[in-house]
A protein has these predicted regions:
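N-terminal alpha-helical interaction modules that lie
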Residues: 1-130, 166-180
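Acidic, Ser/Thr-rich low-complexity linear motifs
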Residues: 81-87, 132-149
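Start-of-helix signal in alpha-solenoid helical-repeat scaffolds, especially tetratricopeptide repeats
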Residues: 90-98, 143-153, 157
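Internal amphipathic alpha-helices that form coiled-coils
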Residues: 159-163, 167
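Conserved small-residue packing positions in alpha-helical repeats and bundles
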Residues: 104-107, 111, 152, 157-160
């Protein structure tokens, strides 16, 4: 079997300015999401981490660090003083956030609004964690550039669901809360 994806790309045109996403079943039987990009496509798992990895045996890298924080607190009387994540760990968390962001874009295009909400919740929790525990404050601050986009995606997903349910007042409340 060839590793060339040319046939797939020939049958799925890239359209500038559009998000083209689809669901496929992987060779392993699991659901995958694909996003067409100009030079190819991105493929990600529909569940858990988009890249399918289990860092340190956990569903996500954030889960690993949250457990590390919990162990630190248990050892230090509930305090999180002296707990930090180094720049390399922050970079790996940033990579995880970007993967979840790509998947949330695909899921929004596919109208899987619950999945968008789940993934944006994960990203926002990750941003909070890095802001609170990055060893270098400027790294924690730099992560915050992703917050407005993530809040916007989450608000669009939740608001769209409210509108679909003809609950316009709740949709407006969601938008106002996001702005605040």
């Amino acid at each position: 079997m060839s590793d060339d994806i040319g046939k797939i790309l020939e049958n799925w045109d890239y359209r500038l300015g559009r998000v083209d996403a689809r669901r496929v079943t992987g060779d392993d039987g699991s659901e995958k999401l694909q996003m067409r990009i100009d030079l190819g496509l991105l493929q990600m798992n529909a569940q858990f981490r988009p890249d399918g990895k289990r860092p340190f045996g956990h569903p996500t890298l954030l889960d690993h660090f949250l457990l590390r924080l919990e162990k630190h607190r248990n050892k230090h009387g509930g305090e999180d003083d002296e707990f930090s994540i180094n720049p390399d760990e922050c970079a790996k968390l940033q990579q995880e956030a970007i993967q979840f962001h790509h998947r949330s874009i695909c899921n929004f295009e596919l109208n899987d609004l619950e999945a968008v909400e789940r993934d944006t919740d994960h990203i926002l929790e990750l941003l909070d964690f890095v802001q609170d525990y990055a060893a270098q404050e400027e790294i924690g601050s730099s992560f915050q550039q992703f917050r407005p986009q993530t809040i916007m995606m989450q608000t669009r997903a939740v608001g769209t669901q409210f509108i679909s349910d003809e609950n316009y007042g709740e949709a407006m409340e969601e938008i106002r809360a996001a702005i605040d």
